[in-house]
Amino acid sequence: MEKYTNWRDNGTGIAPFLPNTIRKPSKVMTACLLGILGVKTIIMLPLIMLYLLTGQNNLLGLILKFTFSWKEEITVQGIKKRDVRKSKHYPQKGKLYICNCTSPLDAFSVVLLAQGPVTLLVPSNDIVYKVSIREFINFILAGGLDIKLYGHEVAELSQLGNTVNFMFAEGTSCNGKSVLPFSITGKKLKEFIDPSITTMNPAMAKTKKFELQTIQIKTNKTAITTLPISNMEYLSRFLNKGINVKCKINEPQVLSDNLEELRVALNGGDKYKLVSRKLDVESKRNFVKEYISDQRKKRK
């Protein structure tokens, strides 16, 4: 792995795009696991159909728990567990929440938190794209490099007043060892929240305060993916291990121009383990090309 030093942060030593070392199950084990999944899917088919018709998030939770042994642990910063109220402390309609991304399953994680229908957002070069759950999953499984192929542009937050809105601000996935630089600037994020600031007096616009909450998502390493991977291979990774997710809903942060406060919050409050801004989506694109090329050479 030393050859990938171009994609290792000089300050922290973290290589955010390197895949985790995961032992693949045997073909026999994979076949057995997929067979069990098929049986579970048939059993849950009525609930799956009902979820597709109603979009009720609690139904999705039941499906995931039975089918994939999904377990989740949710904490709200500053609130004792016994005092947490979903109607007050969980993500609400009309609001925007900033999330990190390590896995296509992050889409399910935020849906289970949401107190209403969900919109998923992924920025790229200051343009915000809206994607469905399926589009988000396909995007991450394809390597998380070209969101414009999966979603469509959305101009402002006011268009999403009837949904709970989650933005995966890094614009791609990483291995969870740090938080990548965002694919949207502070200026553009503020304009997305309130386009009227573009017509304000510059001095007045500068004094306008914006606050957002972040949601830090952690999952077991078998579910984390930074590289293109097939649906079948991805399923086989975690079917025998189950899925364990931890979500932390952080306190609101006042937005700065560089949005570093949001990255720090998503990184568990550790600003010293943030990778540099050069390790962005374009850097990942180059890493993926070289890594896949090297893997092909090894197989020859």
UniProtKB/Swiss-Prot annotation:
Transmembrane feature ranges: 33-53
Membrane topology classification: Single-pass membrane protein
Superkingdom: Eukaryota
Compartments, as annotated in UniProt: Lipid droplet; Endoplasmic reticulum membrane
GO molecular function: 1-acylglycerol-3-phosphate O-acyltransferase activity; lysophosphatidic acid acyltransferase activity
Annotated motif HXXXXD motif, positions: 101-106
Gene Ontology CC: cytoplasm; endoplasmic reticulum; endoplasmic reticulum membrane; lipid droplet
UniProt KW keywords: Endoplasmic reticulum, Lipid droplet, Lipid metabolism, Membrane, Phospholipid metabolism, Transferase, Transmembrane, Transmembrane helix
A single GO BP: lipid metabolic process
Annotated EC: 2.3.1.51
Catalytic activity, reaction form: a 1-acyl-sn-glycero-3-phosphate + an acyl-CoA = a 1,2-diacyl-sn-glycero-3-phosphate + CoA; 1-hexadecanoyl-sn-glycero-3-phosphate + (9Z)-octadecenoyl-CoA = 1-hexadecanoyl-2-(9Z-octadecenoyl)-sn-glycero-3-phosphate + CoA
Stated family: Belongs to the 1-acyl-sn-glycerol-3-phosphate acyltransferase family.
Chain's role: Acyl-CoA-dependent lysophosphatidic acid acyltransferase with preference for oleoyl-CoA. Involved in triacylglyceride homeostasis and lipid droplet formation. Involved in vacuolar protein sorting.
Note: Present with 6630 molecules/cell in log phase SD medium.
Protein name (database record): Lysophosphatidic acid:oleoyl-CoA acyltransferase 1
Species in which this protein is naturally found: Saccharomyces cerevisiae (strain ATCC 204508 / S288c)
Native organism taxonomy: Eukaryota, Fungi, Dikarya, Ascomycota, Saccharomycotina
